[in-house]
Structures are given as structure tokens and as C-alpha cells.
Amino acid sequence: MTKKVETKTYEIKAPQFETIKVKIVGDTPLIVHAWDAKAKREILEKEVFGKSVKKREAKDPIRDFAASMYWLTPMPEELDAESIGKEFENGARFGFPTTAIKQAAINAAYRLGWAKDKASLRPAFQIIADTHGYYGADLAINHNTQSIDIIPNTFKPYDMCEIISDPPVMREDMVKVMNGAADIRYRGEFQNWAMILTVQYNKNGQYSAKDILNIIQAGGYACGIGEWRTERDGVNGQFHIEAN
């Protein structure tokens, strides 16, 4: 006698994407550290031309401070205190990578046991960028002279959310670099900050809007964003969702 085979039918609902506006408010200062063109040049000179690392240049705290931030408006031509101050007075705007905010949320949800793995959380929501780039120094490789030139004030593609804040301040930190040596870093710090996130999710997906908000909230508390964040044994970059 032939055994009857049972069949099951599964309904796959079409994705229904919706967006929500979420305001996150900083609970602790946000420290930013964009990749410095000078540091990148040292790496590339060794890898492209086989040059040994040059004697370290004298530190310029003001320049390092300005270069550490993601400028949404053009940087001043001269990275000195007076020029930077004028840009602040003229309403200079700054951003932060959307990917870092999303990663904080995913890491927190995974560590809290809300998902079996991080991969399943990545398509659950997207953070839509306010702008798709920022101003900073970039590099140009010259094979004829075997040199790498720094090109200032270049618009570099990267998804960014705008930081709503008082003008940033310069902070000085003692850090340990990869070889264990001590170094001093000068970076931008935003003390009273917020961001308005545009979050897109699938209404017919596994996670509801409330779930997504809880995941983002957990990211702000358990992981944080930026340098010396809670995820990295620090106290900075924590945030919460402002209730409507």
C-alpha cells in the first residue's frame, strides 16, 4: 500500500517596507576618530613602495582634532585654531557612520540572546543615511615620483547620520598602540549630542517596529558608539531613544 505523502503549504508574504523616525540622545559624550590620511599614507608607502617608516612627524593637536571628525560641510583650508573656530561659528556640521550605529544594535541584541546569530539580524532593518559622504583628507599615489600626496578637503563616500550637538571640543587621551607603546591622541568630542535616525524595516518580517526600537535601545546602553565606548571597556557613546 502506497503511503500517503502529506504536503504543507507556506505563505511567503511580500515585503512591506516602512520607515520610522527615531531620535537617539547621548547619555555620555561621543568621541569620534575618522581615519587619518597621514596614518594611511605611512601604511601605503610601506606596502606600495616598500619604504621604511619615516621618523614620526611632530604632533599637531589642532590638526589631529580637526582630522578626527567627519565633516559634512567643507573643512577649512588651514587646520588651525582660528580657521576651525570660524567654521564652528558659521555652522559647521558633522556626522557619524550609520554602519556603526547599526552594528552596536546588532551586537547588543546578539549578546542579550535575542537572536541566534548576528547574520539573521542584519537584514531586519536598515538605517538610511542623511548624506552619503563626508569631507576629509584623501590620498593620491604618484608612481612616477614614488610618493603619496595628501589631498585636503576631499568628499569621501560613506553613509553618515548628522550629529545634532554643540560645537565639538578637543580631548586628549593616553592610548596604547599595537606595539604596546604609549601615545597621545587628540580627537573630537561631542558632549550634548543627538541624532535623528531614519529606520527602515519590513513590516511583514520577523521583527516588529517595537522589536527594532528595543534592539537600537539596547545598542545604546550595552555597546555604545565611537571611541572608548562601553563595548570596549569604556563609558562613552551611550544613548537612549527619546520617547515620543
Predicted regions and their residues:
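RNA-interacting cores
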Residues: 1-244
